[in-house]
Amino acid sequence: MDQLAHHYRAHIAELNRRVAEILSREALSGLVIHSGQPHRMFLDDINYPFKANPHFKAWLPVLDNPNCWLVVNGRDKPQLIFYRPVDFWHKVSDVPDMFWTEYFDIKLLTKADKVAEFLPTDIANWAYLGEHLDVAEVLGFTSRNPDAVMSYLHYHRTTKTEYELECMRRANQIAVQGHLAAKNAFYNGASEFEIQQHYLSAVGQSENEVPYGNIIALNQNAAILHYTALEHQSPAKRLSFLIDAGASYFGYASDITRTYAFEKNRFDELITAMNKAQLELIDMMRPGVRYPDLHLATHAKVAQMLLDFDLATGDVQGLVDQGITSAFFPHGLGHMLGLQVHDVGGFSHDERGTHIAAPEAHPFLRCTRILAPNQVLTMEPGLYIIDTLLNELKQDSRGQQINWQTVDELRPFGGIRIEDNVIVHQDRNENMTRELGLTD
């Protein structure tokens, strides 16, 4: 924890600097950041799992306590209003006592509806950041999630501090252990549900603590991009395994994908080719490179694989231009990663929030930024046999370029995706996922 504590001082200083700058521009007194409130299930007395406001957890790793507030102005010591009710029904969060607490003036709130007593008196000139706009209105905030403030903060959140980078390394390190356990479970005959349990046990996190719902897909289920069904029975014939799963550390996410073949076969060779292509794409990352250009380069590599593995005929550029590669690789190459899995700022051209949309032919690309030092992105090329997309090719002349026999042979395997988490440095790329032990 010493290294985190060392970096945390500079992290808080940077957050304060950002706040002071945007407050000066917008003539605001400060920001009041709400951790959030519990959400009650309809007609029930049970709450949905609580997820803290990412703007809140950017400052400190309080992840599971609703009704907390931060009062920051970039100059004074940030104030943390920490919720500790008198409650014999539920576990009450302990008063924080970690390395980060010295940077906050901590006040204890026992009743959520009494928070106004702790807030600034000139509340009308402070901006509320959070989800519960009705609460903000009752409290007297006239500025609620102002666009200028949000755009500025989102743009700069893509540049990670050293503290944030260390948290993300640790999130990767944890997830790698889960992936290794899941891989072993797959080769030992486990079902999707059982593989999930092996993964969660290895990372030491519950389904509500990992940053997103794990994708644990055997055989043809790997063709479903966001498959989360978890079959309890093992398939009669074990062919392939795609796992897309991450872990959390102090509110920061990892997001890693691997694909395995149960036996050495043509599909296994396709995985090897995709792995090689993914590493080549990562080698192309550097400051000044446009992320959409990397996405287009991915389509060229997918086109070459379609030709090499007798899935299609023609030439590389023609397969890309006709949209044939998009039927096999329909999603974007990757996205910003940080406090959120699909982190904010991926389309922001500047501090004002100027939006740079994805190319018209590639609407699902989640990042159009120019790469810069200390950004963290996923790199996740894929190739799938998705019948709904391939059937569209059959409707016109493009279907004549597809080798449907090869498609039929590969369909039971579902698809391939390989995803690493990469830090862009000034003079190199840091592939956290591989460097921390997930080499294949």
Swiss-Prot record:
Residues involved in Mn(2+) 2 binding: D244, D255, E419
UniProt-listed InterPro entries: Creatin/AminoP/Spt16_N, Creatinase/aminopeptidase-like, PepQ_N, Pept_M24, Peptidase_M24B_aminopep-P_CS, X-Pro_dipept-like, X_Pro_dipept
Cofactor descriptive note: Binds 2 manganese ions per subunit.
Protein residues bound to Mn(2+) 1: D255, H335, E380, E419
Catalytic activities: Xaa-L-Pro dipeptide + H2O = an L-alpha-amino acid + L-proline
Any single GO CC term annotated in Swiss-Prot or TrEMBL for this entry: cytosol
GO molecular function terms attached to this record: aminopeptidase activity; metal ion binding; metalloexopeptidase activity; phosphoric triester hydrolase activity; proline dipeptidase activity
GO BP of this protein: proteolysis
Cofactor: Mn(2+)
Keywords: Dipeptidase, Hydrolase, Manganese, Metal-binding, Metalloprotease, Protease
Assigned EC number: 3.4.13.9
Family: Belongs to the peptidase M24B family. Bacterial-type prolidase subfamily.
Role description: Splits dipeptides with a prolyl residue in the C-terminal position.
PANTHER family found in the cross-reference section: XAA-PRO AMINOPEPTIDASE 3 (PTHR43226), XAA-PRO DIPEPTIDASE (PTHR43226:SF8)
HAMAP family xrefs: X_Pro_dipeptid
Protein name, per record: Xaa-Pro dipeptidase
Lineage of the species this protein comes from: Bacteria, Pseudomonadati, Pseudomonadota, Gammaproteobacteria, Alteromonadales
